[in-house]
C-alpha cells in the first residue's frame, strides 16, 4: 500500500472514536491536529503520517484484525528517511539533539513488523516522541510518553518533553543534554544529578569546598 493510499484511507477513518476507556489503545490519537500544529515544520508531515497510521491501526484492532505489516513497513521507511535527513542536516544545535540520537538509534532497530497492536502502539508513540522533542519544554502531551515503559527503558526516567518555564529550560535541560552528549548512550536519568551539579556550579560562588568528582 503506497503512501497515497494511506492518505486516501485516512479520510474514511479519521472520525473513528474509542467507545470505551477500557478499549483504548493508540493513545497518541488523543494528541490530535492541534498538537501537531505546534510541532516544528520539519516534523509536522511525519507526525500527521504517524497519526494517520495509528487511526488505521486502531480501526483494524477494533475489527479484530492484526496490525498491518505493510503499513508498518511504510511508516518505518518514512521514519528512516527522516532520521537520515536529520543526521546529515546542518541545523543549529538543539538541546534535545543527544536524546533524539539515542531514540533514533533505537527506532532503526525495530524494522521487524509488530506482532500485536500493543507493540504497534508503542512504536508509534516512540516515533511521535521523537517528533515532540522538536518542541521540548512546550509539549502538551508529555504524559503519553511518561507512562510508556519501553520509552522509559530508552531514555531513563525523564523524557525532557513536558511543559517547562523558559528559565528551567536554560538552567536544567541544556546542561543535562550536554552531559548526555559527552557520555554517548547514557540514559538521561543517570545524568540528572550531574546536570544539577553543573548548574549549581555555574551559579554558586567559587571555592565553596564541595567536590563532586
From Swiss-Prot:
The lineage of its organism: Viruses, Duplodnaviria, Heunggongvirae, Peploviricota, Herviviricetes. It is found in: Virion tegument; Host nucleus matrix. This is Virion protein US10 homolog. One of its GO terms (cellular component) is viral tegument. The keyword Cell division does not apply. Belongs to the herpesviridae US10 family. Induction: Expressed late in the infection cycle. GO terms for molecular function: zinc ion binding. It comes from Gallid herpesvirus 2 (strain Chicken/Md5/ATCC VR-987) (GaHV-2). It holds the Pfam family Gene66. It comes from the Viruses. Phosphorylated. InterPro entries: EHV_Unk. Keywords: Host nucleus, Late protein, Virion, Virion tegument.
Amino acid at each position: 500500500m503506497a503512501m497515497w493510499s494511506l492518505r486516501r484511507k485516512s479520510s474514511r477513518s479519521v472520525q473513528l472514536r474509542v467507545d470505551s476507556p477500557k478499549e483504548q489503545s493508540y493513545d497518541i490519537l488523543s494528541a490530535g491536529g492541534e498538537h501537531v500544529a505546534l510541532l516544528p515544520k520539519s516534523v509536522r508531515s511525519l507526525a500527521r503520517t504517524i497519526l494517520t497510521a495509528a487511526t488505521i491501526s486502531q480501526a483494524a484492532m477494533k475489527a479484530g484484525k492484526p496490525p498491518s505489516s505493510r503499513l508498518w513497513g511504510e511508516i518505518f521507511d518514512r521514519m528512516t528517511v527522516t532520521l537520515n535527513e536529520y543526521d546529515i542536516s546542518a541545523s543549529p544545535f538543539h538541546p534535545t539533539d543527544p536524546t533524539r540520537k539515542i531514540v533514533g538509534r533505537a527506532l532503526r532497530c525495530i524494522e521487524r513488523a509488530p506482532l500485536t497492536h500493543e507493540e504497534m502502539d508503542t512504536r508509534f508513540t516512540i516515533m511521535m516522541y521523537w517528533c515532540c522533542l522538536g518542541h521540548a519544554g512546550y509539549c502538551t502531551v508529555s504524559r503519553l510518553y511518561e507512562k510508556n515503559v519501553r520509552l522509559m527503558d530508552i531514555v531513563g526516567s525523564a523524557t525532557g518533553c513536558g511543559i517547562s518555564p523558559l528559565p528551567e529550560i536554560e538552567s536544567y535541560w541544556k546542561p543535562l543534554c550536554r552531559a548526555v552528549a559527552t557520555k554517548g548512550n547514557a540514559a538521561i536519568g543517570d545524568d540528572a544529578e550531574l546536570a544539577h551539579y553543573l548548574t549549581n556550579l555555574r551559579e554558586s560562588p567559587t571555592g565553596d569546598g564541595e567536590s563532586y568528582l
